[in-house]
Amino acid sequence: MNKLHSFAHWKSALTLVLLVAGLPASAQTAQPSGSREGVPTLSGYMEVHLNKEQDLPAEADLHRFVLMVGHSFTDRIKFWSEVEVEHAFVEGAEESGEVAIEQAYVDLMLHRRFNLRAGMVLIPVGIVNERHEPPTFHGVERTFVDSVIVPTTWRDIGFGAIGDLGRGFSYRAYVVPGLDATGFTADEGIKDGRQQGGHADASDPAVTGRLEFRRGGLTTGGSFWYGGSGFGLTRLDIEPPTVGVSSLDARYRRGRHELRGQWSMVNIGSAGDLNRALQLQSGNSPNIASRLLGAYGEVATRVSPDSWQHEVVAFGRYELFDTQNKMPEGFLPLEEFQRSALVVGATYFPDPDVAFKFDVVRERNKSSVVNAPWRVNLGVGWWF
């Protein structure tokens, strides 16, 4: 990709972000938030899991330990960061642990409706990718939809705008580097195509955004990601595939009851050409789909008496997550990746910021050969 073409991509992406954000009609002062000026803020969360999968030994894991640091240089210039350690320690490979910067950005507060953000940002798609502290969701593990369809945790270097539009509406919109299509797979879709902000190739940018509405106990949101994924294919004679991600979600809480749902879809352009090109490169076709689709619905109810100071919440969730939903011409779906799951369990809150969790997961797929496993999970998580 030549420099002129790359510049044109970035110019178009920045223009779209500004159009999504909109400019304020007046020049009111943005309201300060975060730590007091000159005083750093420390926060964090942790989650420990005990997982037992069918026919496998039980596994105990300090899955995540995260520290967050914020600082207000002035009432208009604010910094926020998040450093994560996965699986307790690092020993040369991600399977043995990982240290990662999940967020590290600066906000320039200009106006309630329009403020600038730059740095390492979380892609604002779905519910869990931006808000995944353990007490904020039921179940020991994150949802399948937010792991397989929306590749949580999804982060990258970004520049864009955030704001509160009033009447319950807010938004976030960024320009970010694109994906690496050579990492796409049949079972986890675009997950291994994330660049994660480390020496990210920015020649084929993407735009991403979210519009959110809050009113009382209801929160709804619509989000998207759209951009290129072809920089890793420069040696192959194919048109760089574009990727579009769209997602709708809703959360509602009233009294003892909670409802939550999400629908997410990924479209991969030129998936057939991509499969053929990668097969020539590696000798095996990755069988990448042209469309991935996922959705879930969750119901939760507080079952502890009102006289208790602590809360016990029972929940049930049904998920569909199909990474072979639509195949390019000439390719057949792998039925073991057309999946569903039923998750039932309970969460005990001795404090609103501490959660002890239990669930049972029954996963299914359409294959008559590959059996999906069942799992029993225990976990504890907190944040402060």
Residue ranges and their predicted role:
Residues K52-Q54, A93, A104-M109, F137, ...:
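Outer-membrane beta-barrel pore domains
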Residues F7, A88, N365-S367:
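Short strand->helix junction
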Residues P135-T143, G189-D192, R276-L280:
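Short glycine/proline- and charge-enriched loop/turn segments
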Residues M1-F7, L14-L56, F384:
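N-terminal periplasmic/intermembrane-space "pro-region" immediately following the signal or transit peptide
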Residues V145-V148, Q195-G198, D237:
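Short, P/G- and charge-enriched loop/turn segments at secondary-structure junctions
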Residues E188-L233:
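Loop-centered beta-sheet repeat module
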